[in-house]
Amino acid sequence: MDAPASLRGQLLLAMPGIGDPRFEKAVIAMCAHDENGALGVGVDRVMPGITLHGLLEQLDVDPGIAPDCDILLGGPVEQRRGFVLHSTDWLGEDSLLVEDRWCLTSTLDVLRAIAEGKGPARWLVALGYAGWGEGQLDGEMRRHGWLATRAEDGLIFDHRPPRRWEAAMRSAGIDPRLLAATSGQA
């Protein structure tokens, strides 16, 4: 059997029948996917009760000139762990370059650089991530729980989080109003 194609650098869009309310209308930026599992960061939901300035203050980082923007809920795994998904114009020592499209950094140096106005041009901050064990995501893809689509930077960085799923579906040529959670049988 052939190994599944890597979804790294793509967006996963939750289909209506995904069956897990944590992922309803989810948009996941896929950062790693191989035979051992997969990791992505959700870019569609705002984390309630915390903004960037609040997070920086908790981490003893002066917010400096950083905008006080929303923090996103990156996924259900390790929600106390932070991730910055950002453009490739800034690379830290521990940044993960994802298909020459964007980077994922989970160290304080990127937050300090953002606060000082020396960070990446485009970025978002998320707490938590979406993770899948060996073969798990591949099974969900076979059951049509997710749609993989091209990850356009504008979808990730420019649209407001609640609108990203619909915008990504439309970008993939799908009218979300026409999707059904269940299908019939002949």
Curated annotation (Swiss-Prot):
Q: Could you tell me the superkingdom of the organism this chain comes from? A: Bacteria
Transmembrane segments annotated in the record for this chain? none
InterPro entries linked: AlgH-like (IPR003774)
One Gene Ontology cellular component annotation held by this UniProt entry: cytosol
Known HAMAP family for this protein?
UPF0301
Record family assignment: Belongs to the UPF0301 (AlgH) family.
Q: What is the protein's name according to its record?
A: UPF0301 protein Swit_2673
- According to its UniProt entry, this protein's organism is Rhizorhabdus wittichii (strain DSM 6014 / CCUG 31198 / JCM 15750 / NBRC 105917 / EY 4224 / RW1)
Recite the lineage of the species. Bacteria, Pseudomonadati, Pseudomonadota, Alphaproteobacteria, Sphingomonadales
